[in-house]
Amino acid sequence: MGAGDLLGLGVDLGSSGLRLALVGADGHSLAERSSAYPRPFEDPEGWRQGLATLVTALPQHLRQRIGAIAIAGTSGILLRCSADGAPRGLALSYATACPEQIPTLAALVPEGGPAASASGSLARALRLWGSFPQALNPSQDLLRHQADWLMGWLLADWRWGEEANNLRLGWDQQQQRWAGSIAAQPWAQALPELVAGGTGLGPLAAAVAASLGLPPSCQVVAGSTDGNAIVLAAAPGPGDGVAVLGTTLVLKQFSPQPLAGAGVSNHRLGGQWLVGGASNGGAGVLRQFFSNEQLEQLSRQIDPNRPSGLALRPLPGRGERFPIDDPELAPVLGPRPVSDALYLQALLEGLTELERLGWQKLQELGAPAVQRVLSVGGGANNPQWRLLRQRSLQIPVLNRAKASAAAAMGRWALASIGWEQPAPPEIRHE
């Protein structure tokens, strides 16, 4: 089989389900699959079972052409596992804030960094360290994020982690080391050995390759976060920002320099800094009140030029990461008007205000002013929401609902074949 016949398998572990895409040498998808997690989102076995089910459902003749696989994981999902990958309980969600860890965080890492927040992965790691009857044993226990744990299953080797997934755990991408005094802690051995996204880590474990029906030569490539993957899929140009309208609201843009601020992430990608933040609010809050069918029907009744007059803060629960870093910030979901369409409009306006504050926050910290917003994710299918956002932001807002994070990871994986340490794919400018 020639190199041009090989396919890249990209996996997107979203907060609402799994997606995968098979990508050919021309960059186009040959097949895409998606499903909900077969277990609760925080159960790691559900990630593994869901991936195995989707992969084995692909036609065998296509599976035999897969040359590399890369995974984008939901940023901030952290679990404790044994050295051979066995989960020791459920993972802690990205929305889990740990305000009781603030004094310890202050002693470990510099103030204002991504790991200094009570909503960051380092705070969750500290809670995992102290919340089990048997203390964390660094020689027998590991702390891994979602994508890194699943990557370990593919390799039957859980020592690796990918940089972007570990920034809020305390990895300093500029200095290429753990921030503050993290490396001096007795539990530092439980942290992963980090590599850059796009790095080839070796072939699939033989047993995994056999169970999935994949070639034993298939390479496992370090992926990225789901937010970074969807930015690659959206292909932003100069001056563009990318808003991911999924279960949560994620904002990303390119900046000539990294930013310093609570709740803000900085990723080195394609020779630039991809900066941004993720709110706990998003379309997931809408689903607390409406089905997808209701959302579609009620949205048609919204007049974007007539404000609802309500001021809601659509958070799924207490605590926020970005644009406000406050583990005690409470949602505001009422008063609820009689009209369901008006209530939906008010919720969308509340999410729009979170977005406006987010872009404003990034600019205050030193990012260039966004001139245009590209919208991806499920919310990018809603034209009324787009108009509400465009009116609030006072800049063009375009919907790119077909952008696929899984396909972006497939292209990322395919680009790695033949290189020992492949560079991340270039960002395409339009």
Where are the regions a protein language model picked out?
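Short beta-strand-loop/turn "lid" adjacent to the catalytic site in phosphate-handling enzymes
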Residues: Q60-A95, G112-S119, N137, A147, ...
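Intrinsically disordered, low-complexity regions enriched in Pro/Ser/Thr/Gly and acidic residues
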Residues: P186-A188
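Pocket-flanking alpha-helical
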Residues: I77, E100-T104, V231
